[in-house]
Each structure stands twice: as C-alpha cells, then as structure tokens.
Amino acid sequence: GKGKSTFCSYIVGYRHDYDGSVLFDTTCAKNLSVDQWVDLRRAHISYLFQELRLFPELTAWENVAIKNNLTGFQKESVLKEWFERLGVADKLDAKIGHMSFGQQQRVAMIRALAQPFDFVVVDEPISHLDDDNAAIMADIMMCEAHRQGAGVIVTSIGKHMKLDYEKTFKL
C-alpha cells in the first residue's frame, strides 16, 4: 500500500493517472502512442511484474520462449543456463500453473531478461525466494544489466535484493 507497484506501472506506461511528467529522453510518456509504447517495451524497458503475469497453461520454457521469440535477443543456451543456475531446469516442461510461486518468480525473471533493455524494472522480485536463490537471481540480473549497459529499478517491501544500490528511495 505505499505505491511501489503503481510507481512501476507509471514508468512502464501501464497507467497514466498521475500528475507531473514521466519523460523518455525529452518525450512525455503521456504523449506516446500505443505503437511507441510497444517499441519502447520491446527494446528499452523490461518489466518483472509483482504478480508475474505468466501464462499458467503454458510450460516454463514456453513462457520464456514467447518473449525471446518476439525479441530474438538471447541465445537458447543462455536461457537454459539461467534455468539451471536458478534451480528450475527440471521444470522446463512443467506447466507454470503447477509450479510454486517462488519457481514462477525465477521463470518470470528469466523471461524479463530475454530482451534488450536500457532499464529493467523489477517489482518485488524475490518475495517468495530463499536467500540462495535470491542471490543467484540478483547476480544474473546484474550481470545481464551490466552486459547491456542498463539500469535496474527494484521495488521491495520486507525482503530486499542484496545489491550495491547507487540510490534508494523510500515511499
């Protein structure tokens, strides 16, 4: 109830019911067309939703492949390495709806990283992870952000990603 998810939805353009301005370069977000938002989200902003928004009837691999097929960005071998590191390689063919929320969070992070981005926005990314998996997820995310020269925006309440934050803001 502090507005963290709402803040994220302003940044990625899912909500426009705010005062003030959100600018991309010098363009006001409220003035972007649907097509411009699609392009922005496909190539510049990746978003890991708090509620994940995975397709429960699809497998873990299919959920990631949908994004990767749209962007053609990551090599399949890289994605499978991330599945392995995050302990969900044995779930590639499992339906998302049959996986725990923590397993789903790991799959959703892999999906979020399966595209180019200037910023990755992650909303409560480790709420259902143990410390080991949270650390692995943070490492994968930061390595990929560094590789792409991208920024990272993280929201959390309670469980925080252990990162070397440049700036923090409390809402």
Show where each model-derived region lies.
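Conserved ABC ATPase "signature" region
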Residues: 76-91
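ABC ATPase NBD coupling module
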Residues: 29-46
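Catalytic Walker B motif of ABC-type/P-loop ATPase nucleotide-binding domains
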Residues: 120-124
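Short coil-to-helix segment of the ABC ATPase nucleotide-binding domain corresponding to the Q-loop/switch region
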Residues: 58-65
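Conserved ABC transporter NBD signature motif
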Residues: 20-29
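Conserved ABC ATPase signature
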Residues: 95-103
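Helix-to-loop junction immediately C-terminal to a conserved catalytic motif
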Residues: 12
